[in-house]
Amino acid sequence: MTYVLGIDLGTSSLKGILMDEVGNLITTKSAEYQIDTPKQGYSEQRPEYWIVALESVLTGLSVEISDFGQQLAGISFSGQMHSLVVLDDNNKPVYPAILWNDVRTSKQCQEITDRLGQRLLEITKNIALEGFTLPKILWLQENEPEVWSRVKKIMLPKDYLSLWLTGNIYTEFSDAAGTLLLDIEKKQWSEEITDAFNIDRRILPELIESTDRTGFVKAEIAERYKLTNEVKVFAGGADNAAAALGVGLINEEVGLISMGTSGVVSAYEPKIADYKGKLHFFNHTVPGACYSMGVTLAAGNSLNWYKETFGKGLSFNELLSEVYTVSPGSEGLLFTPYIVGERTPHFDSKIRGSFIGISAHHEQKHFSRAVLEGITFSLRDSKDIMEKTKNKKFKRLISVGGGAQNPDIMQMQADIFNSEMIRLTVEQGPGLGACMIAAFGCGLFDSLEAVTKAFVHYKEASFIPNPKNVARYEQIYQIWKQVYKNTSEISHQLVEFNDEG
């Protein structure tokens, strides 16, 4: 038996997934760490938190699995995107990692937009947002010049783990694509962007494919965990790219709907596509491919907010128990899930959520259904942009996250998206994609398609659109789409009013 290990470096925890060479799950281990918020809007972590967590996971695996050390062949990673790690000439961190959800960089985003204009979108296929890496670099240059003077290498979080394991510094294209420094099409660091902001390209890591080897586990670490083989380490991928691989997003026929705190719609892209900044566009873990991604900022978050505000004391099952006695369209009640602003397709941080069409006959069950429908309508915005731009409709959509556990929500998705919906037998998230990269890299399979066939499995039952419901949803969705343009100015005025208070 041969084992491969996928390490998923998340925002609040690190998870290790151990699988065998035919795709059977052996076990999982995880370790949590803190997020530091020294000031409002700041979100940081010390890279050593991640190392402590990785050590804990490796220890747990070596204790639980008796032949872990003898059978482990390869390790790969998935990791939180965009977060900035800066090292000195001894490869030691000189500043806490500034995380993807840190929002201190609004000024720097405007500087990037003003200086590069349309060229930023042409080169990186993305617009400047606080989450990306380049604004964090500029903030460090401007606000911590002494720290910046000591920076000899810039890294991304998962690559710091690879450095610790192997002693080598690399990154791969799916994570580099989230920095705003990568020329997506040429697959190289952009001279135009680095020159514009006085960034020495020598401090950027060497670029390789997700499936390329970064090295071998160092002897002292191998000895500590009794690894008897020369364990290979592979570059891995950004969390969303690894998650896409881990659900089988390796061709254009399927799309991915993921509903967690935020909602994500992803599509495989065999070549460069021009979404004109309406969607995120990144290199994939599949060599030579890309993926597009639309984001609903508050998907599950809207449902959680609704429950805590209007259903306190109720379980989710109780809150939603009567939703399916209400007809599609919630009898004329609409909800927009813009409670923290919105990403796709509006990129509007000052838009706010709303219930529209409240009537005297509406009960809690109508509001509950309207929330679910509003979240799904927002996800449909992204799906429709993808299909219209590609002029190609998805044959099936894979649903993961909280919504995939509820058959009624799955049917609602099928009806609103007008697409067959399928589910995984077991969800393991980005870490599964990392395992798949390690399995391919170790030569256990001759293609990522073969790995996918062995590692990714779907439930037999799917959810088929109901034509009557599809027609009703098409009608109400066209009305729902008008809410943004008719409430955005009011929302902006309300945000300004609240800020003044």
From Swiss-Prot:
It catalyses: D-xylulose + ATP = D-xylulose 5-phosphate + ADP + H(+). The active site is at D239 (proton acceptor). Keywords: ATP-binding, Carbohydrate metabolism, Kinase, Nucleotide-binding, Transferase, Xylose metabolism. One of its GO terms (biological process) is D-xylose metabolic process. Transmembrane segments: none annotated. Signal peptide: none annotated. Its EC number is 2.7.1.17. GO terms for molecular function: ATP binding; D-xylulokinase activity. Belongs to the FGGY kinase family. Catalyzes the phosphorylation of D-xylulose to D-xylulose 5-phosphate. This is Xylulose kinase. It comes from Lactococcus lactis subsp. lactis (strain IL1403) (Streptococcus lactis). The lineage of its organism: Bacteria, Bacillati, Bacillota, Bacilli, Lactobacillales.
